[in-house]
A protein has these predicted regions:
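Short, polar/acidic, helix-capping and beta-turn segments at strand->helix junctions
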Residues: 2-125
Length: 125
C-alpha cells in the first residue's frame, strides 16, 4: 500500500505530485528544488542551493521517521556540470564517510524555476 509523505518543513509540491511516497520499506522522494519552505525563495549559488535541496530531503525523510543514513540512492540533476565540485563538497557533509549512498549526477538542459540543482532519493525504513 502506498502512503504519501508530506511535511511543512519542506516546500510544497509545485505540481500534481507528492513530496514523497512510502511503499513497503522504501521511501522515494520527488526531486527537491532548493526552495526555502519558510520564504519560498531560492538561495544564491550552487553550494547554498545544494544545502537547501538536501535540507528539504532531510525534512521529508524525518517526516517518514528515518534519517539521511537510510538513503540507498540519490540522483543529482545539475544545470551545469561545472558546478559538480562545489555541489559535491556540500553533499559530502550530509553523509557519514564510508556509508555514502549510491549516486548518479547528470547535467540537464534546464531545471524548474531555473534552479542550479535538484536532488531526489530512495531510502529504506
Amino acid at each position: 500500500m502506498k502512503l504519501n509523505i508530506s511535511t511543512d518543513h519542506a516546500p510544497a509540491a509545485i505540481g500534481p505530485y507528492a513530496q514523497a511516497v512510502a511503499v513497503g520499506n522504501l521511501v522515494i522522494t520527488s526531486g527537491q528544488l532548493p526552495i526555502n519552505p519558510a520564504t519560498g525563495a531560492f538561495p544564491e549559488g550552487i553550494a547554498e542551493q545544494t544545502r537547501q535541496s538536501l535540507t528539504n530531503v532531510k525534512a521529508i525523510l524525518a517526516e517518514a521517521g528515518i534519517g539521511m543514513d537510510r538513503i540507498l540512492k540519490t540522483t543529482v540533476f545539475l544545470s551545469d556540470m561545472n558546478n559538480f565540485g562545489a555541489m559535491n563538497e556540500v553533499y559530502a557533509a550530509f553523509f557519514t564517510e564510508g556509508s555514502y549512498p549510491a549516486r548518479s549526477a547528470v547535467e540537464v538542459a534546464r531545471l524548474p524555476k531555473d534552479a542550479l540543482v535538484e536532488i531526489e532519493v530512495i531510502a529504506a525504513k
